[in-house]
Amino acid sequence: MTNNVRGYLQLHPFHLVGPSPWPIFTSFSLMDLALSLGLTAHGYIASIWPIFLAIIAVLYSMTLWFKDIIAESTYLGDHTLAVKRGLNQGFLLFVVSEILIFASLFWAYLHSALNPTMDLGMQWPPVGIPTISPAELPLLNTIILLASGVTVTYAHHALINGNRTNTLYGFTYTTILIALFVYFQYLEYSYAGFTLSDGVYGSTFFSLTGLHGLHMIMLTIMLMICTWRVYNYDFTNTSHVGAETTILYLHVLDVIWLFIYIIVYWWGS
């Protein structure tokens, strides 16, 4: 894992991206997925195959898109310091937008929780809603996420110090922990005594935890890509933008989950 200087051989600091089909393919795949989910939820489609095919299309488009980006960075030397700075700034803006989305969902939850109406029985949680104990699976998931923060920080320090073996171990352990989190979240949904259609409590609960769970699935894929790139000698101790953005993404989701645990599971139950 020596310093990679291939990104400094260009005569200008900008990356002039060539024509790529993957943005439009990904956009149409996401539109197909959204339509399939909406039509299935409202009973217009009786089969889950359209959703399954849409997910395959999204993953296929994103995989080939990421493949091109990795080739541009690692093998073509297109990612100069200016390009890396732009990628980091763009990802920070993405993180800010994600925080604002979760802030709006917290607002919706607290708007009803702090002032429950007569329709909710003048109490929160509403009458007849069996809440999930914060001392069971939610607490276990919180411990798992905190542990993943430790292992990914271990991987980050190993990467900066040029220790490929420990970096590989750190990312592998982190990937396993995040996958366990997603699995336990699935178990929690399976045994929950309420659904998305159970009033404002069910809709806000599953919107918050479900959106976070979707991001955790995305994070699992990102960690798997980082683990593979470390194994493939793609990262160096000075050039690892993909790893840094993934690590930042994990820490942001950790903090958001702590707010979900405190507000939704502990205070809200």
From Swiss-Prot:
It is an enzyme of class 7 (translocase). GO terms for molecular function: cytochrome-c oxidase activity. It is a multi-pass membrane protein. It catalyses: 4 Fe(II)-[cytochrome c] + O2 + 8 H(+)(in) = 4 Fe(III)-[cytochrome c] + 2 H2O + 4 H(+)(out). Keywords: Membrane, Mitochondrion, Mitochondrion inner membrane, Translocase, Transmembrane, Transmembrane helix. One of its GO terms (cellular component) is mitochondrial inner membrane. InterPro entries: Cyt_c/ubiquinol_Oxase_su3 (IPR024791), Cyt_c_oxase_su3_dom (IPR033945), Cyt_c_oxidase-like_su3 (IPR000298), Cyt_c_oxidase_su3-like_sf (IPR035973), Cyt_c_oxidase_su3_a-hlx (IPR013833). It comes from the Eukaryota. The chain crosses the membrane at residues 21-41, 45-65, 90-110, 127-147, 167-187, 205-225, 247-267. One of its GO terms (biological process) is mitochondrial electron transport, cytochrome c to oxygen. It is found in: Mitochondrion inner membrane. Its EC number is 7.1.1.9. Component of the cytochrome c oxidase, the last enzyme in the mitochondrial electron transport chain which drives oxidative phosphorylation. The respiratory chain contains 3 multisubunit complexes succinate dehydrogenase (complex II, CII), ubiquinol-cytochrome c oxidoreductase (cytochrome b-c1 complex, complex III, CIII) and cytochrome c oxidase (complex IV, CIV), that cooperate to transfer electrons derived from NADH and succinate to molecular oxygen, creating an electrochemical gradient over the inner membrane that drives transmembrane transport and the ATP synthase. Component of the cytochrome c oxidase (complex IV, CIV), a multisubunit enzyme composed of a catalytic core of 3 subunits and several supernumerary subunits. The complex exists as a monomer or a dimer and forms supercomplexes (SCs) in the inner mitochondrial membrane with ubiquinol-cytochrome c oxidoreductase (cytochrome b-c1 complex, complex III, CIII). Belongs to the cytochrome c oxidase subunit 3 family. This is Cytochrome c oxidase subunit 3. It comes from Candida albicans (strain SC5314 / ATCC MYA-2876) (Yeast). The gene is COX3A.
